[in-house]
Amino acid sequence: YRDMTVPYRAHYLTRTVEEVLQREKIPYTIYSGVQFFGRAEIKDALSYLRMIACQDDLSFLRIVNQPKRNIGERRRRLLQEQAAQEGCSLFTALRRSVGTEAFRGTGAARFVSLIDAFSSDCSGRSVSEVLSAILHESGYEAMLRTEGSQERLDNLAELKQSVYEYETTCGEECTLEHYLAHVALFTNADAGDSRDRVKLMTVHTAKGLEFPHVFLCAMNEGLFPSKKIRTLPAMEEERRLAFVAMTRAEQGLYLSEAAGRNFDGTDRYPSRFLL
C-alpha cells in the first residue's frame, strides 16, 4: 500500500475515498489534513443528528453551545450535577432548568424547542432533509458563513452528499437510526499502527514529491477545475495544478471521474483536463 498515493483538489473530497478504504480494510494516512469524519464540523453535524435520535450526553456536550448560546462550562457543570442527582440525561436536566434563574439570558429554551421539534417530526422526513434543516435552523451554517469558513462549509456539503448517496442505496429503509449506525463504522474505525498505508493528500501537498502509483480521483467539472474558478488566468493555474498532480507518478497514473448527480440534482461531467 505504501507505493499508492491519492492526491485530491480539496480536503472535503476525501470522504468517499475514506469510506471505501475503511470498508475494504485498507490502511491509509492523510498528510496535512484530518480524516473526514474526524473534522470538527462533521462531528458537530452528526452530534446534532444524534441529539435528534437519542439525546445522548456526549452529543449534548458537543453542540449545546455550538453556535454560542451562553451555556458555558459553569452552566454545563450545573447540568451535570443535576443530571447525576436526578438520574436523567443532560438534555432532560436542561429542559427542567429552562425557567430557572441560572439559565435566564441564554439560548437554552430555543435549543430545547429545536431538538424537541425535530425529534417529534423526523420520522416523516428523509435524513438528508433533517440534516439540511437542523444545520440551517440551529444557526450552525450561519455561524460558519459569518466566520468565513468556506472549507468547513464545503465539508458539510460533502456530508450532505454522503447522506444523499446512502439514501439512494437504501431506499425507503433509510431512517435516521440506520444512517447513524452506518456512519458509526467510519467514525470508530481503527487503522492500526502499520506504516504500510495508502497516502492521501492535497495536490498542493504533493508538489515536489513523486510516488510509484498515483490515483487522481474526482476529475469532474466543478471539482477539478474548481467551481470557484472565474477567470482565464485562474483556469490556467488549475491546468498547471492538474499537470503537477499527473506528473507525481513514477510508474502508474490512474485518472477517474464520477458519473451520476450531485446533491443539488445537477449532472456530473468529466473534467476538461481529461478530454
Task: Give the positions of each predicted feature.
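Short, surface-exposed connector motifs at secondary-structure boundaries
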Residues: 1-3
